[in-house]
């Protein structure tokens, strides 16, 4: 009898959890606040499950609870649920505040990333033809000093670790990302805008 194929991607692990515990985890729609310490419950329930390792489980759970959809669900008075969907305790004001701060920081990073992307796109766009004669010459504005380019340094795959902050080279613009998983020659990362992607090790750099 062949062994079941192990789940290596956080997305697949979350889908599997939603399948095994539908009253607790969801992959779309409103999320439910999870019981504090639910990882221990998961590890115990899936102790004999060869499809999911504890390491993958922990990474997937962190990814799930840091998603905007989940952070929106953490509101004062909302009931946290266990793996069977049973209400166990209410979300405190302190926990809601922490969730809101995390959400605010995440949105700010995405906005900053989009702003940088738009600036880069504007620089690459061809300049429009200017009319030969203009009624009034516009006053020249002082040029802003150019931002220093980020210096990148190569990094070996075996020197990377889950949770490490890295730079991903996509085109000419390096993007900040967090390492989620390491798999042979590939590295799964989460960009600041929340997008999860898998890239080759030669696309991963560190700030010099």
From Swiss-Prot:
GO terms for molecular function: RNA strand annealing activity; RNA strand-exchange activity. It is found in: Cytoplasm. One of its GO terms (biological process) is post-transcriptional regulation of gene expression. Residues 99-115, 126-135 have a biased composition (Basic and acidic residues). Gene3D superfamilies: ProQ/FinO domain (1.10.1710.10). Residues 99-149 are annotated as: Disordered. Residues 137-149 have a biased composition (Basic residues). Pfam families: ProQ (PF04352), ProQ_C (PF17516). The keyword Nucleotide-binding does not apply. GO terms for cellular component: cytosol. SMART domains: ProQ (SM00945). Keywords: Chaperone, Cytoplasm, RNA-binding. Its main location: cytoplasm. NCBIfam families: PRK04950.1. Belongs to the ProQ family. RNA chaperone with significant RNA binding, RNA strand exchange and RNA duplexing activities. This is RNA chaperone ProQ.
